[in-house]
Amino acid sequence: MVLKVVYYKKREKNQTLDDITNNESINNTNEYDLSDDSDLSYIIESYDDQNEEETEETNDDAVKLLKDIRKSFTNTEELKEDEFKDNNIVFSFQNYLFGVNKEHNIFNLQNRITLDDKILDYPTEPYSNTNSNFFNTRSINNNSSTFNNDDSNNSIIRESRNFSNQMNISEISSDKQIDSNINTLIEMQRDSTKFSAEITKTISKLNNTLNTINQNQVVLHKTIESHFIKITESLNYLIQPQQQQQQQQQQQQQQQQQQQQQQQQQQQQQQQQQPQHNNNNTQVQPPPPSQQLPPPPKPQPQLPKPQPQKPQPQLPKPPQQPKPPQEPQPDLTSLLKPKIKKQPPKEQQQEQQQQPPQEQQQQQPQEQQQQQQQQQQQQQQQQQQQQQQQQQPQEQQQQQQEPQHKTTTTTTQNNYHNNNNNNTTTPTTRTRFTTTNLH
């Protein structure tokens, strides 16, 4: 198994990637047989400027990996594609990439593997697609250039170079396909980004429209409220005069009713007071009975109120007890007749009463009218009380006088009726009770 290694010069600090990949930077190219373990010592010798311990650890890891690769390629029967499930088997060594590419059929190279060297700026740049199989080393001992320079090795090198050239042609075509696929993926990503940008734009537009709708709703609510307030104010302005007119009309009606009531009361008072003001000499003939109206009740002269007598035990009065002289009480009918004659008819009363016109009465202030009404009511109440007081002593006198003037006479008649059938006589008695009032 042959390992092809391309040696580069040591990379300096300020050296760029393009400077390193130039042809001038290539130092030497050698091929090694991986079957011999001693060859690996020349390949994996390297150093680290910062820490030597880390280089030893990483060198050990790299040696193990290379040994595993050598074992897998020595026996062709044991080689399987399932061992390399991923597209690339990549490992890092001294901050550079090492890898074996599966897509270019590395397994079918007749147990020969070619590892072309290419230095990369790891991890900013990926490994190169120009060469399918590569093995990167940072620095290798220059003494290895004098190793294995016999003719057999030269023939193997020629064969491997020819085969590698043939493979490079197929690799270039496959690389083009890969690049095209990558470009399509990039275009798809761009399209997806464009589509996502369009989606975000549409979402932003929708959000803006929603915000404008909400603002318009708020403005509409405010305008509706303002219009509603204006409508209510206008309605109130229209309704208030009507209500005022109705109130004024009601007040006028109430005033008219009060004035009518006052006029009626004044007329009644004047009718009651007119016979007192008439002269005693003037006598007016009463109207005929057809036109005669019932006179209004007049107040009777006030009598001293009888003191309430205490109940005394009633004793049998002697029959011949002297009675106090009582004045003969005049008959009520006789008292009423001359008064009825003196009352003039209703028409004459209205003529004699000098009433002020209604205009003058209406001009009087309402306070005087109210005072007059109160006085009239008080007078009427006093008159009613006087009448009740007068009626009470009269009833008492009548109750006292009735038992003294009443006399009862009983007459009995005995009638004997003969029964013709039985020849018997049955007496029947009839009694009569008569009462006479002595005045």
Curated annotation (Swiss-Prot):
Signal peptide: none annotated. InterPro entries: MBLAC1. Residues 268-284, 350-439 have a biased composition (Low complexity). Residues 268-439 are annotated as: Disordered. It comes from the Eukaryota. Residues 285-328 have a biased composition (Pro residues). This is Putative uncharacterized protein DDB_G0294196.
